[in-house]
C-alpha cells in the first residue's frame, strides 16, 4: 500500500509540473502567478514524498518543517493569483508585505526546528505511520502562526 501511495504522490507531482510548464508559457502576470503557485505545489509534493519515504529522524523533521513552510508560501502565491485575477493587486500591498514577512519568519523557525525541536519532533517512524508530536511549549507558536 505504501508503494501505491508513493507512486500516487509522484504521479501528482509530475502532473503538477506539467501544468506549471504549461502556465509558464503564458506571458502575462496571471500565467506567471499560476506557474509560481504550481511550482510551489510541486516542491511541496516532492518534500512530502521525502517526508514519507526517506528514512532518518533529521531528514523527516526537516521535510515536515519544509512541508509546513511551503503551505505558507502556497497560500501567499494563491493570494497573489487571486489579486491578479480580480485586479485588486494595489489594494492589498500592506497585506502582501505582512504575509511575506510572516512567511519568511515562519520558514526560518520551521527549518531551525530541525535542530532545536522547539515546535515539534518526530516521536516514531514506522512503516505504517510517522508520529509527529507538537511541543506543549510551542502552543504560543501554534496559536500565533497556524490559526
Model-identified regions with their sequence ranges:
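Individual alpha-helical transmembrane segments in multi-pass integral membrane proteins
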Residues: 1-13, 27-114, 138-141
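Conserved small/polar residues in nucleotide/adenosyl-binding loops
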Residues: 145-147
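C-terminal ends of transmembrane helices
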Residues: 17-26
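Juxtamembrane membrane-water interface segments that cap and precede transmembrane helices
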Residues: 122-136
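Juxtamembrane/interfacial segments flanking transmembrane helices
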Residues: 115-121
Amino acid at each position: 500500500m505504501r508503494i501505491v501511495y508513493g507512486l500516487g504522490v509522484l504521479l501528482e507531482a509530475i502532473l503538477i509540473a506539467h501544468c506549471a510548464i504549461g502556465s509558464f508559457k503564458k506571458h502575462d502576470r496571471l500565467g506567471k502567478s499560476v506557474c509560481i503557485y504550481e511550482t510551489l505545489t510541486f516542491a511541496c509534493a516532492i518534500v512530502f514524498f521525502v517526508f514519507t519515504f526517506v528514512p532518518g529522524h533529521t531528514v523527516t523533521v526537516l521535510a515536515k518543517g519544509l512541508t509546513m513552510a511551503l503551505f505558507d508560501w502556497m497560500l501567499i502565491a494563491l493570494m497573489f493569483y487571486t489579486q491578479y485575477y480580480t485586479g485588486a493587486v494595489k489594494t492589498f500591498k500592506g497585506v502582501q508585505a505582512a504575509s511575506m514577512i510572516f512567511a519568511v519568519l515562519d520558514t526560518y523557525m520551521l527549518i531551525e526546528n530541525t535542530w532545536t525541536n522547539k515546535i515539534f519532533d518526530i516521536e516514531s517512524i514506522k512503516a505504517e505511520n510517522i508520529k509527529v508530536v507538537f511541543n506543549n511549549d510551542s502552543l504560543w507558536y501554534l496559536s500565533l502562526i497556524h490559526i
